[in-house]
Amino acid sequence: MNTRFFARTAALTAFALAPSLASAHTGLGHVDGFAHGFTHPLGGLDHVLAMVMVGLFASQLGGRARWLVPASFVSVMVLGGMLGLAGIAIPFVELGIGLSIVVLGGVVAFNLQAGVAAAMALVGFFAVFHGYAHGAEMPESASGLAYGLGFVLATAALHAAGLGCGLLLDGKESAKGALFVRSLGAVAAIAGVGVVSGLV
């Protein structure tokens, strides 16, 4: 598949999903639940950084990983969200979220060329913690289905943004572009250390 076409498609997906946030504020009930779910991943720097890093990681791996890695994150995140909604406790949620930024930022910074299965397993592991946090923090008045749809779409949009950014820079076939992507990973990893240490 043409890299430039794929990059534009990913970027357009992110922008296409964004208006859903505005329209979600036009009502209450199920729609209000969607709004809460959509804004939850966008309201925390930890979630935003990790989601974008997943997209950048997928862009660096190329091939099938471009869609399998983000898809595996979203799929496992849904399972984590169900655990959170059910009130089933899992340990070290906040630590897991913080470490996800450090690790995912690190693999982007070092341009780690992992196998597709290993990459899916890595992002899937951290997806449990992010999903759990989304589910556990759902407002009591919100519809579980609408809320879940909201945070799934927001997460997918952030993945698409990272993927599109990575592919657009890679499409320039520039060493500077690749270095910039790796620099973004390094910045995210440093921010993740701040999250884990409680400084951010």
What are the roles of these predicted feature ranges?
Residues 2-200:
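Membrane metalloprotein/metal-transporter helix-bundle signature
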